[in-house]
């Protein structure tokens, strides 16, 4: 007999405005505890010192996490010029310095090389796995790692402000797997002056925005209350980038059993990914083919 999962069967999204000094996993654990939820997970790690959007999926919404991790994300960050660190952020040991300070036109010109499809080497202190071990664990032991470059789509990278000669504030919109610390490091190298991230904030991730996020302090204050539950957004928010197809009653019943089900299509093309709903509730995600949705993920709501 299977073990009964403890907690409430809550499905949806809680958008947290993560504070600095807290890991993404710690935020997820706090949300799970505060809501008494059976299951929770996040849609994209933020470094402990970073702030901003951490979208926490609850229950059946965890099945939609890939659609948020694959979505575009926006980061606002400050690069400290003239100083390189082991971690490529302000927490690390200083390993290089330079007196050179580029002018704004030089920075603007250098940013062009970081837009579009780029190849990016992750920071030494990152969660990338090297022969089964996390890079940050090996780096802490003093190993110098030769990490492979990875592709990254950068939709935009803009200079926002220049508070002084030592600092430049940037905003980047990018796809899955981007390391802002690598951008700061590589930009500093391109400018011949070194650089690291001084602070970082994720302002939006897919459909979720920081201004809609709840603070950890508020989560603590409202823990175990129905008022906190009112902050949970519908599961369907995680499917914002996919077309919705209303299912027929019979189609919904078949989809819930994992079988192809009839849906009412509009302008969805054959072979396109979509999600089916019935009476306002998500039923399944799948591939549309000739009047039916062939499910790949079924929601038990």
Swiss-Prot record:
GO terms for biological process: mRNA pseudouridine synthesis; tRNA pseudouridine synthesis. One of its GO terms (molecular function) is tRNA pseudouridine(55) synthase activity. InterPro entries: PsdUridine_synth_cat_dom_sf, PsdUridine_synth_N, tRNA_psdUridine_synth_TruB, TruB_C. Signal peptide: none annotated. Its EC number is 5.4.99.25. The keyword Repressor does not apply. It catalyses: uridine(55) in tRNA = pseudouridine(55) in tRNA. The active site is at 47 (nucleophile). It is an enzyme of class 5 (isomerase). Keywords: Isomerase, tRNA processing. Pfam families: TruB_C_2, TruB_N. CDD domains: PseudoU_synth_EcTruB. Belongs to the pseudouridine synthase TruB family. Type 1 subfamily. Responsible for synthesis of pseudouridine from uracil-55 in the psi GC loop of transfer RNAs. This is tRNA pseudouridine synthase B. It comes from Cereibacter sphaeroides (strain ATCC 17025 / ATH 2.4.3) (Rhodobacter sphaeroides). The gene is truB.
């Amino acid at each position: 007999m299977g073990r009964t999962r403890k907690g409430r069967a809550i499905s949806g999204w809680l958008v947290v405005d993560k504070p600095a000094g807290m890991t993404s996993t710690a935020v997820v654990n706090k949300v799970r505890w505060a809501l008494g939820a059976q299951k929770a997970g996040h849609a994209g790690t933020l470094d402990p010192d970073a702030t901003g959007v951490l979208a926490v999926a609850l229950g059946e919404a965890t099945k939609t996490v890939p659609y948020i991790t694959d979505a575009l994300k926006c980061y606002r960050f400050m690069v400290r010029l003239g100083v390189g660190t082991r971690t490529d952020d302000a927490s690390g040991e200083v390993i290089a310095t330079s007196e050179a300070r580029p002018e704004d036109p030089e920075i603007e010109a250098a940013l062009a090389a970081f837009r579009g499809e780029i190849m990016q080497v992750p920071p030494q202190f990152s969660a990338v796995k090297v022969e089964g071990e996390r890079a940050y664990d090996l780096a802490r032991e003093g190993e110098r790692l030769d990490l492979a470059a990875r592709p990254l789509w950068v939709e935009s990278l803009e200079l926002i402000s220049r508070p002084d000669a030592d600092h430049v504030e940037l905003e980047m919109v990018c796809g899955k797997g981007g390391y802002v610390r690598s951008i700061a490091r590589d930009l500093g190298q391109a400018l011949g002056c070194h650089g690291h991230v001084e602070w970082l904030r994720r302002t939006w991730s897919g459909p979720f925005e920081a201004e809609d996020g709840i603070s950890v302090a508020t989560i603590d204050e409202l823990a175990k209350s129905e008022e906190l539950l009112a902050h949970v957004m519908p599961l369907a928010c995680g499917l914002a980038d996919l077309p919705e197809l209303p299912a027929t009653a019979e189609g919904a019943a078949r989809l819930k059993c994992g079988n192809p089900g009839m849906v009412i299509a509009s302008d969805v093309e054959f072979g396109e990914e979509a999600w089916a709903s019935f009476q306002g509730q998500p039923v399944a995600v799948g591939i549309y083919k000739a009047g039916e949705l062939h499910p790949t993920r079924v929601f038990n709501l």
